[in-house]
Amino acid sequence: MDAGKKVKAFFDYYGGFEAIIIEHTVFMNSPKTAADLALVQGAILGSAGQSGTKIIGKVSPITWQNYLGNKKLTKDEQLAIRAKNPGKSVSWYKSYERNLRKERTMRLIDVIYDRKIADNDVADACGIGHWSLNNWEKAIGESK
C-alpha cells in the first residue's frame, strides 16, 4: 500500500506525533468518494500507530465548521444563490454552495490567525486544528 508507506515516511521524518485528530469520513452522495477517503484514513491511522502515535481523535466536518463560524447555508442564502443563477442543475448548486463554504473557511482562518491560505484542504486542516485545540477532551473522546 503506497499511501501507507508514504504517510509512515512522513511521520518518521518528523519524529512521529503524540496525537492526531482526523476528520470523520462522511457519506454524502458518492459511495466511491466515501470509500476512497476511508482507505486514505486507514493508511493514515495505521501509519500513525506504527510510528508511535498514542492518541487518535476525530471530529465530524459540521462540528468543526460550526465551531469556526461556518455553518450550513440558510434557506434564504440558498434561495439567493438560485435567484442569481437560475436554471442550473441540483449538482451545480451543491457544488457552488460547497465552494462558497470552502472560501468562507479560508477567510475565517485568515481572520483568526492572520494567515492567507489559498488551498481549501489546508484551510480545512487549520479549521480542524482550531477546533481540536479548543475542544481537546471532545476530540480525543474523553468527557470532563
Where are these regions (language model features)?
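Phosphate- and other anionic-substrate recognition elements at nucleic-acid/protein interfaces
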Residues: 1-144
